[in-house]
């Protein structure tokens, strides 16, 4: 199983150098100076590969499930290219996000803007990662009937993510703690816009367009997919927030920092919803401080308030809700109405199985 997963990743990884060469060839063809070409190559190599690649690989997985067969070389390349475009989008977000948050490390290495000699040039570097998406889409998909849908999908998703980022930045600035701005409703808004659209809806919608799934005036398959994937993305982020507090660092692979970073996390919002006035004071006095003892006091309060049990109950509710939504997709072999295009439950089950009760 692990071997199959490693092979799948390797096959996906092998597409990246081809895309990098196309992008660098474009700069060379435009007569750009060699130092600019080298800089762009370094930007690409440092920021695009190297993550978990879940978003990118899920485009390929979804195309395979929708087609119901192995992909030929051309189909695989096109699906992987779209997957890599999602990874380019993620890189664009992360490079700029790290600057806004003044983060120190990302994926076990210094954030790009902290690399010697980069500094604020990282702003333009992030723009170039975004621009690369549209160069690749035009080069490989311009003649496809769904090309405009791909463009709109990337543009819409980018704007949605930026709106989510704005709400997050003004709700929870690192240098000014004001828990009165926090609420579970606001947390939900941030999560849906900042994470769920680009991490969950985008990869599946890309797969649907490539497989020729059309929009429909009634029972639109894209609206149906979104109605399942947005709650799925919300559940994923709540899980992420909980693991930041509850998972041991050696399992999580990093040290959780949501408390000291004043993050508008599900945990603090769940605590605020349950806290007595005295407990609320503990949160007000200790949350968002760069102080180990203050962090320990917040964690102790989470334990006292039963945040672990609260999360376990949330997880079961979320799972049951998402399973129920998936079951609204007609089962294979069932009759579908005229004009309805068959979505496959398996696309969504694959996502849910990957994240249900995960430990990291």
UniProtKB/Swiss-Prot annotation:
Task: Determine if Disulfide bond is one of this entry's keywords.
Answer: no
Annotated Mg(2+) 1 binding sites: 97, 101
User: Where, in this chain's numbering, is Mg(2+) 2 bound?
Assistant: 97, 101
> Domain of life, per the record?
Eukaryota
GO biological process terms on file: farnesyl diphosphate biosynthetic process; geranyl diphosphate biosynthetic process
Q: What is its EC number?
A: 2.5.1.10, 2.5.1.1
Q: What induces it?
A: Expression is induced in ganoderic acid (GA) producing conditions.
Q: Which GO terms describe its molecular function?
A: (2E,6E)-farnesyl diphosphate synthase activity; dimethylallyltranstransferase activity; metal ion binding
- Keyword presence, Repressor: no
Q: What does this protein do?
A: Farnesyl pyrophosphate synthase; part of the second module of ergosterol biosynthesis pathway that includes the middle steps of the pathway. The second module involves the formation of farnesyl diphosphate, which is also an important intermediate in the biosynthesis of ubiquinone, dolichol, heme and prenylated proteins. This module also plays a key role in the biosynthesis of triterpenes such as ganoderic acids (GA), a group of highly oxygenated lanostane-type triterpenoids which are well recognized as a main group of unique bioactive compounds in the medicinal mushroom Ganoderma lucidum.
According to UniProt, the name of this protein is: Farnesyl pyrophosphate synthase
